[in-house]
């Protein structure tokens, strides 16, 4: 749980430190603070990687070129640096969760604040931390340095290469991604995920606020170790048990930290798995596909 919790706050800003167990990156020396509206207190908050989410969204006009990727990364960096709405189960009674969810539904919390929305100031992300949230970091700086060296070495860049880099530098966390349009379904899905986090069935999660230009919002649900297939599948099952029926995709954080997006020059697929809801015939509630090998896992 520690690694996933750190990833939620994770770095991507070039932060990181020495080895350490688990697979999460450190948030760049805690350069910013996450605002918790629970109890009207500002709490020290760890960040998620700035590139991780917006690059997963459909790009404007269907574009997926370098300019678009850089623009999305910049937008995500800005979101990472702004205050967050955080429900921290380590310091806040679980009995307060329903009121918090009702006060800050993600379809109504706006990215830059609005007099008619629950927030008058900018909000970067909305997050739920489980009781087991324990910051832990991998060596993101070492990972990025090794990546730069690899690119200039002339050696092949393959999924196996990136997997080994992640293992070597203890950057093993990853996340299931859930994309939904603003509205009741999004709010209902986030409420189910947040409850699962607070009750200990999931570890830690975040959701993006509503953008000014509209478009889908995204929920990220973290796991400690993308190489632990059983753990990844267990998280998928918990997400389905929380009532989520839409398509899920799973992305290791190593791709995020190294800035590898869709339509990249190495022709790498940054998402390892996809999960589709299945009604009946499967007690898990979903069918999970290994995208790289085109093999069904469940």
Curated annotation (Swiss-Prot):
Listed InterPro entries: Bles03, TIF_eIF4e-like
Extent of Gly residues compositional bias: 11-25
A UniProt-annotated Pfam family: Bles03
Compositional bias (Low complexity): 1-10
Gene3D superfamilies: RNA Cap, Translation Initiation Factor Eif4e (3.30.760.10)
Protein origin, superkingdom: Eukaryota
Region (Disordered): 1-66
Signal sequence, renumbered to the chain: none
Basic and acidic residues bias (residue ranges): 41-50
Family named by the database record: Belongs to the UPF0696 family.
Name the UniProt record assigns to this protein: UPF0696 protein C11orf68 homolog
Species name: Mus musculus
Gene: Bles03
């Amino acid at each position: 749980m520690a690694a996933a919790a750190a990833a939620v706050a994770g770095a991507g800003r070039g932060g990181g430190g020495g080895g350490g167990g688990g697979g999460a990156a450190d948030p760049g020396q805690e350069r910013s603070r996450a605002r918790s509206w629970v109890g009207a207190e500002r709490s020290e908050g760890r960040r998620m990687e700035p590139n991780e989410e917006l690059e997963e969204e459909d790009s404007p006009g269907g574009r997926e070129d370098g300019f678009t990727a850089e623009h999305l990364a910049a937008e995500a960096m800005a979101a990472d640096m702004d205050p967050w709405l955080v429900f921290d189960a380590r310091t806040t009674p679980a009995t307060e969760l329903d009121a918090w969810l009702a006060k800050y539904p993600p379809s109504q919390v706006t990215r830059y604040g609005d007099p008619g929305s629950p927030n008058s100031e900018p909000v970067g992300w909305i997050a739920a931390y489980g009781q087991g949230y324990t910051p832990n970091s991998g060596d993101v700086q070492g990972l990025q340095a090794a990546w730069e060296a690899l690119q200039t070495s002339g050696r092949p860049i393959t999924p196996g290469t990136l997997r080994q880099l992640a293992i070597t530098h203890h950057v093993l966390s990853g996340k299931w991604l859930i994309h939904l349009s603003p509205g009741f379904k999004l709010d209902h899905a986030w409420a189910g995920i947040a409850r699962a986090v607070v009750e200990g069935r999931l570890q830690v999660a975040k959701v993006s606020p509503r953008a000014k230009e509209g478009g889908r919002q995204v929920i990220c649900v973290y796991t400690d170790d993308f190489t632990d297939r059983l753990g990844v599948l267990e998280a998928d099952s918990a997400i389905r048990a929380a009532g989520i029926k839409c398509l899920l995709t799973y992305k290791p954080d190593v791709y995020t930290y190294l800035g590898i997006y869709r339509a990249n020059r190495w022709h790498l697929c940054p998402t390892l798995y996809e999960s589709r809801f299945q009604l009946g015939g499967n007690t898990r509630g979903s069918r999970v596909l290994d995208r790289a090998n085109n093999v069904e896992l469940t």
